[in-house]
């Protein structure tokens, strides 16, 4: 869905860089995993490709990375869109997701359909199962392996659910996008958020939970494009 979204954005005269963060997708694997390092990765990427300023869209973990990057390097950020996350700590457990993925012996999996059938033991949402199956890729021996560094992500996911702390506020405007059916953004934590992002705006997308770009891609695209 991010690929589809990025293609549509690029058709509106934007140069788009679609980045996988460390231990995710096609990016490198590392035993170290926290927001400070992911901000460093993004800054190094911009330096490597001589990018002087950006508009950033970040969802969930990517949203927290985007917020910390903007706090540390405000002069490099033109527009900031944070999708269904706040700079606060969350008491959410991802154990079921990690358990489901790590319980599969990928050497015995012969097809994606077989992988999806295994995940049905854990999840009822077919769309979410398909989302998790995007972690699969073919290994050199013709079998399957995970793109993401699942074992390290499980070991360090408390770093992802932790809050973003910084000694200065971000003085530019920022747009927070909330999914109507998601509980990641609430009024109490918005008060905390306003201390770091006093000029924030909030919009809500109907018929969507946490995975807004997947559940209501049309409204999500329209809101992002209009803001950019």
Residue ranges and their predicted role:
Residues 3-11, 15-57, 222-225:
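Active-site loop/oxyanion-hole signature of alpha/beta-hydrolase fold enzymes
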Residues 92, 107-161:
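Conserved alpha/beta-hydrolase catalytic His-Asp/Glu region
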Residues 208-221:
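Catalytic histidine-centered segment of alpha/beta-hydrolase-like enzymes
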Residues 67-72, 77-110:
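Flexible "cap/lid" loop of the alpha/beta hydrolase fold
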Residues 140-196, 201-204:
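Conserved serine/cysteine hydrolase catalytic core
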């Amino acid at each position: 869905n991010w690929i589809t979204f990025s293609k549509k954005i690029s058709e509106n005269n934007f140069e788009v860089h679609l980045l996988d963060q460390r231990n995710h997708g096609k990016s490198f694997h590392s035993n170290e995993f926290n927001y400070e390092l992911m901000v460093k990765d993004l800054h190094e990427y911009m330096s490597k490709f001589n990018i002087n300023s950006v508009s950033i869209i970040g969802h969930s973990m990517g949203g927290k990375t985007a917020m910390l990057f903007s706090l540390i390097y405000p002069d490099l950020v033109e527009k900031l869109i944070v999708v269904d996350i706040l700079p606060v700590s969350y008491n959410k457990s991802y154990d079921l997701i990690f358990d489901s993925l790590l319980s599969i012996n990928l050497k015995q999996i012969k097809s994606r359909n077989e992988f999806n059938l295994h995940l049905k033991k854990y999840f009822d949402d077919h769309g979410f199962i398909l989302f998790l199956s995007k972690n699969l890729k073919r290994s050199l021996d013709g079998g399957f392996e995970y793109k993401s560094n699942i074992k390290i992500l499980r070991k360090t996911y408390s770093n992802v659910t932790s809050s973003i702390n910084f000694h200065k506020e971000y003085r530019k405007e920022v747009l927070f996008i909330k999914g109507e059916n998601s509980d990641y953004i609430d009024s109490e934590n918005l008060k905390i958020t306003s201390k770091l992002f006093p000029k924030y705006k909030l919009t809500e997308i109907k018929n969507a939970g946490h995975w807004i770009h997947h559940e209501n891609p049309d409204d999500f695209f329209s809101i992002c494009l209009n803001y950019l």
